[in-house]
Curated annotation (Swiss-Prot):
GO terms for cellular component: nucleus. Disruption phenotype: Impairs the transcription of the fusarisetin A biosynthesis cluster and abolishes fusarisetin A production. Residues 58-88 are annotated as: Disordered. Keywords: DNA-binding, Metal-binding, Nucleus, Transcription, Transcription regulation, Zinc. Its main location: nucleus. Residues 13-47 bind DNA. This is Fusarisetin A cluster transcription factor fsa5. GO terms for molecular function: DNA binding; DNA-binding transcription factor activity, RNA polymerase II-specific; zinc ion binding. Coiled coil: none annotated. InterPro entries: Carb_Metab_Trans_Reg, Zn2-C6_fun-type_DNA-bd_sf, Zn2Cys6_DnaBD. Residues 68-84 have a biased composition (Polar residues). Signal peptide: none annotated.
Length: 465
């Protein structure tokens, strides 16, 4: 315990420290060992010095290290913010923070001046320092602090932001219904489909179906695998177009809302930048109509990214080559079939009478019938693929056979809405695979159409249709 006459606030007695005052110990009391301050003697109360550790800094260091009022207020705010409101240490923390504050010389006499306290009488002591009970450290001090006591302790930044912006940062998952339920990405699905198509082609090329000696072996031909690949391709494309069509509509609605209210003179015209007729002539397309076979999904093709569109065209090319291989096997087998049923039906025709019924007719070659049915099923599936892909009619292996002037005239308005970007991209990709010297574009891709025509002619010839 310090025996100096002038005590600091930290080393003052409990009564003086509660009033935030420095106490002065009388010299005669120091020598006698009673250690009572002058204010407690005048007030005739017990002077109690609590267990407070004396500051290690000397009096001279304290006077030299006194801070300005602004720095003291910042220190008070920083230290008060670390104290939890309502904790028992709040009173001690505020006292220790205010120890570094001082009153300037121009604000009046010093609080530690002994003459000031000597002039004060006993009767005026308690009335002069009467304070509200809310600022006294009592056992229920947690309920007595007012809101103004914590004005120097600002709210932590993270808690303030979490309170204010807690609702703003919550995502509305209802706007994205398919984000958590969708399967693999379209690029992953298309890549796996390309691998399956190439594996099926390799299996058919290396199998015994390339050289069929008996007609019974054709019964086990795996047309189901080829049909399944076509159906899977159509399903994947439908999902791609549906998602891209939704994104395209959302982007168009956003663009329309952004451009609403703007001056019409600020928007640019397409003909000022690019001549559309000149662009059509560069890709070999007349301005009158587009070369597309269908416009169901071609208008959405411009929103599909380049890797996805290249995989789509790669799947279509691989599937086309697979169909050509299958039809080549069918044609090779039908060309070696004997004409056994022709003579039978010719000799049996005189025996047919008036009561002949349809069920009594002898059936034609069962192999030709099944091959014809298989060709029709496969072509229907492939035509569905072409419809979903939205390729030009010149690249279609099925639709270009039924292309006529009447159909073109009836659906000219539909063709005009097709996508030039898909037309140009498809021809650019397919030209890279052309090996012949023909001037016509994509001659190799049209080999499937040639196979289909040749196979149909052979079936009609064998069945005498």
């Amino acid at each position: 315990m310090s025996t100096q006459n002038n005590q600091s606030i930290r080393s003052s007695c409990d009564r003086c420290r509660s009033h935030k005052l420095k106490c002065t110990v009388a010299p005669e009391n120091t020598r006698s060992g009673s250690s009572r301050c002058t204010r407690c003697i005048r007030a005739q109360v017990t002077c109690v010095f609590g267990h407070r550790s004396q500051s290690k800094r000397s009096t001279n260091v304290k006077k030299a290290d006194l801070r300005s009022g602004t720095n003291g207020q910042e220190t008070t705010s920083m230290q008060a913010s670390t104290i939890v409101p309502g904790s028992p240490d709040l009173w001690v923390g505020r006292q220790e923070v205010e120890e570094g504050l001082h009153i300037g010389s121009d604000s009046g006499p010093s609080m530690a001046d002994g003459d000031l306290w000597a002039e004060l009488g006993t009767n005026h002591d308690l009335s002069l320092f009467d304070i509200t009970p809310s600022s006294l450290p009592t056992h229920n001090s947690q309920q007595q602090f007012s809101a103004t006591d914590f004005c120097s302790a600002p709210m932590a930044p993270h808690s303030a932001l979490s309170t204010i912006n807690s609702q703003e940062w919550q995502l509305d998952l209802s706007e994205y219904p398919n984000q958590t339920t969708t399967g693999p990405h379209a690029i992953v699905q298309l890549s796996a489909l390309v691998a399956k198509i190439h594996e099926t082609s390799r299996t058919l090329e290396e199998s015994f179906w390339t050289s069929l000696a008996e007609s019974n072996q054709l019964k086990s031909y795996p047309i189901g695998r080829v049909l399944s690949l076509s159906q899977d391709f159509s399903t994947i494309l439908e999902c791609i177009w549906a998602s891209k069509n939704m994104d395209c509509k959302q982007s168009l609605s956003c663009a329309a809302s952004d451009n609403h209210g703007q001056d019409a003179t600020s928007s640019f015209e397409l003909e000022d930048v690019l001549d559309y007729g000149e662009l059509l002539s560069t890709v070999g397309t007349s301005p009158g109509r587009s070369d597309f076979s269908t416009s169901t999904h071609s208008s959405v093709a411009t929103t599909v990214d380049m890797p996805t569109m290249l995989l789509v065209l790669s799947c279509y090319t691989s599937l086309t080559k697979l169909y050509s291989l299958v039809f080549e096997h069918f044609e090779s087998h039908l060309s070696h079939l004997p004409h056994s049923y022709t003579s039978q039906t010719a000799h049996a025709s005189p025996k047919w009478g008036l009561g002949l019924q349809l069920g009594e007719l002898p059936s034609a070659d069962e192999t030709c019938t099944k091959v014809y049915t298989a060709v029709q099923i496969l072509l229907d599936a492939f035509q569905s693929v072409e419809d979903v892909v939205g390729l030009p009619r010149s690249l279609s292996a099925v639709r270009q056979q039924s292309c006529g002037k009447e159909e073109e005239g009836e659906s000219g308005d539909v063709f005009n809405r097709a996508s030039l970007w898909t037309d140009f991209l498809a021809k650019s990709v397919f030209k890279a695979t052309v090996k012949s010297s023909s001037e016509e574009d994509c001659e190799e891709i049209r080999q499937l159409s040639i196979k289909v025509k040749s196979l149909k002619s052979l079936i009609r010839e064998r069945m005498k249709l």
